[in-house]
Amino acid sequence: MTQTLDTKEDPLNLGGGWASSAPLRTWSFGPRRRRGAPVYRRRPRYGPKAEYEPPRKQAKQQYGPGPWFQPPWRPYWAVYSNWGRWRGPWCPPPAGFRKPPGRVQVIRVYGLHPLCLCCCSCCHGPWNPGWARPPGRKKRWGRRGRGLRRHPRRSAQRSPPVDLSTLLRPVNLYGWRAPGMRAPRNTTQFIMNQIYEDMRQQEKLERQQEALRAQQAQAASTASPEGAFGNDVPPSGGQEDEELQDTLYSFVRNPSLVFSPDPDEEKQTATSQLVEEEEEGEREEEEEEWCDEEECDGKELESQEEDEESEAKDEEDEESEAKDEEEGEEADYMEEREEEDEEDEAEEIAEEEEGLAEDEQTEEENHLPLEMPLSFLVGAEEERENFMNCTYLSPKQGIPKVAQEALFMVQDINC
């Protein structure tokens, strides 16, 4: 009986070596739990009920692969125990086990279910958990966390069949519009063409109505005994409004009507002009009969003299007015020049006063007039000569010895 030092491998010290009573802790990245804490099995959670479904207290009975007799599956905690597949402690297989596998084992390895109904090991269903799966699930390798395509408890929602007659036919890309197509390639152009076609139909209808109205008016005018003067009678109010609206609408629709007058009006105006010309001719003839030739000549001479006198007077008045205007303009110009000169003088005086005030301010700031030489700033004459004669400054002269405290002293700025 061998003693194992690792209590995890053999907690009861049964001497089982690696196949001890406690299963090995796997190298998983799941949460490590403390001793005595309950184990929450990680069930695959996907679908709509994953957020609300609490973890099960007891493992659900797994589905078997078929209706024949099966011993219950081993629980997940007994997978690695030394109790073998059919109860009893684990023992190594017999020596004759190392023969090539029979047909039943080959079938089991490659995923086919053997069909013998005895209680041997080949009948206990597939050992690979990927083979035994509840109905309604589809195994997809490599898609574990992405959820099912269809939830198992939800029936497939059958969409109603699409009515293809309501859909547009496919667009004909190459030729003209096919007879079955609802719209052409350029739908906007098609809509605009429809609009223009409607407008043309409307104009055609209006023209027909206008022709009908003209025929009715002609029939009415021929039927009435007054003839041309019958048109001058004003119609009643409602008819007048309707006619006004019709004429306005026709002007909007056909702008050429704006510049061409109505044919009935043309006839009326032509007849009225002829009547007026005849009356004027009669008046002139009467005037000529009334006045004799001599009187007419005297009247003509008098009228010529009066015209000449009035022209001479007008010319004199114009000349006098032009002279008065020129004199007035000259006087205004002189007055404007005098006013401008006075304004310029006042501006110059003000600028001079401002300049004097600024000069006084600068003198107060500098305390020095501009004429004073700057030579006195250098110092006395002896010092100046010494300064000019000294070609090179020695380092002792250039950097005088001053106490360190004086160098770092900061004078009071506020004084």
Curated annotation (Swiss-Prot):
Biological processes annotated in GO: sperm DNA condensation; spermatogenesis
Chain residue ranges for the region called Disordered: 1-20, 29-64, 133-162, 202-241, 255-372
Composition skew (Acidic residues), residue ranges: 275-363
InterPro entries from the UniProt entry: CCER1, Coiled-coil_domain
Biased composition (Low complexity): 211-220
Superkingdom of the source species: Eukaryota
Key words, A-Z: Coiled coil, Differentiation, Nucleus, Spermatogenesis
Annotated localization: Nucleus
GO cellular component terms given for this protein: nucleus
Classification via Pfam families: CCER1 (PF15482)
Feature: compositional bias, Basic and acidic residues: 1-11
Chief location of this protein within or outside the cell: nucleus
Parts forming coiled coils: 197-224, 264-366
Disulfide bond entries: none
Biased composition (Basic residues): 31-46, 135-156
Function: Regulator of histone epigenetic modifications and chromatin compaction into the sperm head, required for histone-to-protamine (HTP) transition. HTP is a key event in which somatic histones are first replaced by testis-specific histone variants, then transition proteins (TNPs) are incorporated into the spermatid nucleus, and finally protamines (PRMs) replace the TNPs to promote chromatin condensation.
PANTHER family with a match to the protein in the record: COILED-COIL DOMAIN-CONTAINING GLUTAMATE-RICH PROTEIN 1 (PTHR37337:SF1)
Protein name: Coiled-coil domain-containing glutamate-rich protein 1
Organism encoding this protein: Bos taurus
Protein's gene: CCER1
